[in-house]
Amino acid sequence: FGWGKNRAALKAKKAAYEAEVHSYEKSVLEAFKETRNAIVNFNKIKEVYELRANLERSAKSYMDLAQLQYINGVINYLDVLDAQRGYFDAQIGLSNAIRDELIAVVQLYKALGGGWEQNP
């Protein structure tokens, strides 16, 4: 007989098994958390994109209106330049929102486990 060797080995195997189960559960929970965070982030960034797109359209309309008013002598050229600056700022904001949205899509895709290769 093994004087308790077998029993000690069984306890060690059970402890190792429970540690692996705990590690697996922790990994699964972390994956769900990353996925949820990526989805929330994507939705927020999509809202920002929509707001920036609306702002860009409004700034374009304002710039067009300012140009017409200048042509008709209602406003001076500095007002047109100010409207153009606002439009260009809105375009930059929209470009940044598009970039952020694309980055969020990649992060979501990675969180879902897609397209990741360690050694391409």
Where are these regions (language model features)?
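Outer-membrane beta-barrel channels and translocator barrels
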Residues: 1-2, 32
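Short loop/turn motifs that connect adjacent beta-strands in outer-membrane beta-barrel proteins
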Residues: 3-7
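Amphipathic alpha-helical coiled-coil segments
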Residues: 8-93, 100-111
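Terminal intrinsically disordered/low-complexity segments used for targeting and assembly
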Residues: 111-120
